[in-house]
């Protein structure tokens, strides 16, 4: 279906707005993946706070100009599916990585975070905010418990020497 100029401008504006508000972006090629599987992926993306869109490469190049995702221009070859993470930087990467494991024909082309091309594995393994807080609290709790144990041991040793 041919797009007129207004449609193209609307697509560019929509993708540009999504890019400006996104924390990270992931590019993939979904050739050969069934419609049912893609529908499942889109549903999972909505639940994870990920904006997905299939866009023509020329329109996508224009849409990412002036954004942090301009570095991805070289990956805009062939059918391009772009996903922007809105709530967590690793959400789209994690979603695409899991989907690629189950679907051999789904190929992840690249990812960007804070204006730089990143490894998808790196983005997918980023902890969520809640996970990061839990790790920090665990570390703090361990340190406090260890310090208390050493203090009590030193006090016990001091009392034994005095006795």
UniProtKB/Swiss-Prot annotation:
It comes from the Bacteria. It holds the Pfam family Ribosomal_L10. InterPro entries: Ribosomal_uL10, Ribosomal_uL10-like_sf, Ribosomal_uL10_bac, Ribosomal_uL10_bac_type, Ribosomal_uL10_CS_bac. GO terms for cellular component: large ribosomal subunit. Part of the ribosomal stalk of the 50S ribosomal subunit. The N-terminus interacts with L11 and the large rRNA to form the base of the stalk. The C-terminus forms an elongated spine to which L12 dimers bind in a sequential fashion forming a multimeric L10(L12)X complex. The keyword Signal does not apply. GO terms for molecular function: large ribosomal subunit rRNA binding; structural constituent of ribosome. This is Large ribosomal subunit protein uL10. Belongs to the universal ribosomal protein uL10 family. Forms part of the ribosomal stalk, playing a central role in the interaction of the ribosome with GTP-bound translation factors. SUPFAM superfamilies: Ribosomal protein L10-like. GO terms for biological process: translation. Keywords: Ribonucleoprotein, Ribosomal protein, RNA-binding, rRNA-binding.
